[in-house]
Amino acid sequence: MLEVDFMKFEAKFKAEKNKLYTMDGTPVAAEGCRTITACPGAALDLNDGEFAGLCVNWNDAGRDEDSYNEEFLAGLRDQLKEFEERHIFVFIIPVAGSNEPASAEEDAFIASFKHCARRIKDCECVAGFAVPECVDAACFISELSAKHGHYIFFSKSDALLADGGIVRY
């Protein structure tokens, strides 16, 4: 069983045998949950108390450190803070879009979502991140865990799910 501590707040979730639970052991329906695309400033169709995947496009977040979209990331943080008020919880799904990173761009893709994680680190409604299939999973998890050890990681990949601490979605 994997239990994690949030840096600035109490842990809300734990992962066990590819399932997500609240800290009191109540199952959370992560597998098959709805996924929506982040759109800061827009009202998203989520119900109070819902758990969902929130897709964040690489182009929206910024493709490299010279082009991180701080306006988008600030809007994303504001949207996540609104989710907190409605007890909506999400995990971030990094999306490469039609521009899957070539191996030379993989580091930039990971760095972009590491930067995204820094910008939303105080959002209690974020349970963690999905591990993108287009990058080295161990590297992605290691990079995000270095400063954000409280995140739980999610995947649909059977190979990654061999680690019972990764949650199936």
Write out the residue ranges for each language-model feature.
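Active-site region of glycoside hydrolase catalytic domains
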Residues: 114-169
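Active-site-adjacent "subsite" loops/lids of carbohydrate-active enzymes
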Residues: 98-118
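A broadly structural signal marking compact, well-ordered functional cores
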Residues: 78-83, 87, 106, 115, ...
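Aromatic-lined substrate-binding rim segments of carbohydrate-active enzymes
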Residues: 41-98, 141-152
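Short glycine/proline-centered loop/turn elements that form peptide/ligand docking sites
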Residues: 94-101, 133-137
